[in-house]
Amino acid sequence: MLNQDQLHEKILYPVTRVRAEKAGGSGVLVYSQPDPKNEDENINIALTCEHVIADCVKIKEEWDAVIKKDVKKDFMEECRIEVFDYNGSKISSANSTQATVIAYDKNHDLSAVRLHNTKSMPFVAEIIPKNEIELLRLFDPVWVSGCSLLHDPFASNGSLTYLREIIEQKEYLMYNAPSIFGNSGGGVFEGNEGYLLGLASRISTIQLGFGIDVMTWMGFCTHPERIHQFIEHQELQFLIDPDDDYYSAMERRNARRKDGLRQLFFKDQGNETQVDPKDYEITEKKDF
């Protein structure tokens, strides 16, 4: 079990508050490493739920001069992240910074944002390794840590109550640690090692007459397997692989975008032939 210092450092300190245009919630810092291209700066990444920052993603159909057709493109607006500094159990300061969405997946309800604040973040969450997921058991202790009703971060404890809940064809963990609106995007942490299992994303409600009762003890977080699927599909392996880095990940993402446009062009032309990427250079706005 985690001691008092570990509970602070692994469960509480990595949690942030997230504010978008029309929504708010929580986030979890998962990466803070020196920026190899900018001395004395760090690259800081937080995870949150896609529905928390959904207003920051604008989908528009625009004419693409390369493939000569209208193409749906996403345009990112910035969200605001509040990072908290602590003196033991007390908040010493709350620092607001803008952040840019670098990846999102509506299906998994997950997104990754890069903070504009480049100072080192000493406390980041550790995502549960893939080979540890199968060891999870009912009654395992968990902590839900987030900004309930957009309050400053705090944690509540409970246990795992269901290991594979299927909701709308998606897998979740269920837990009985109390959670409420505003916890979305906050962390659900394993209580023995402090691993980040998933992000709080759903709670149970029941309608009684004209009112809605919230079952705060029936919370759901993205299944940890889906966290790893998101990381792999979005080319964000640097979040869990020390041999990878942010800039390599962004290059892979840009290459996939370009390849997708090329394949769309040749499919539209009735030509499935593979092409050399060097033959078709596509200029795009790069991720922050």
Outline where the language-model segments fall:
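Catalytic-histidine neighborhood of serine endopeptidases
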Residues: Y31-Y104
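Short, surface-exposed secondary-structure boundary micro-motifs
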Residues: C49-H51, C147, E193, R202
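Catalytic nucleophile loop of clan PA
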Residues: V28-Y31, P178-S201
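A conserved glycine-rich beta-strand in the N-terminal activation segment of trypsin-fold
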Residues: Q4, V15-A46
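Short coil-to-beta transition motif at edge beta-strands of beta-rich domains
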Residues: L12-Y13, M76-R80, L135-V144
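Flexible, gly/ser-rich surface segments that form the specificity/activation loops bordering the active-site cleft
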Residues: T100-A103, F123-L173, S179-S184, A200-M215
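Short, conserved beta-turn/loop elements at beta-strand boundaries and strand-helix junctions
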Residues: A23, S32-D35, Y104-N107, L163-Q169
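C-terminal cap/linker of serine protease catalytic domains
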Residues: M1-D5, I59-V71, L196-F288
